[in-house]
Amino acid sequence: MTIREKLQTVKTNKKYRTFILIKNKNNEKLELVPLTFQSMIKDKLDQEFISFKKEIEHYTKETVLTFVI
């Protein structure tokens, strides 16, 4: 299973309240995943990915942290 597939799978689980929004450098939304999924993302993607902006946005009244990759 690819990372993208894993992200999609977790994203569809509605029980989470805090999410990570992953964007590319063009500010396009790539994925939205639960905060609890953060460690798997850090383990699997480049270390540059960890230059993680703690930008807080609102996504359907939920807290969203933004990563730019």
Region annotations inferred by a language model:
Residues M1-R4, M40:
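Short, structural beta-strand-to-alpha-helix junction motif
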Residues Y16-I69:
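Detector for the mature cores of small, proteolytically processed
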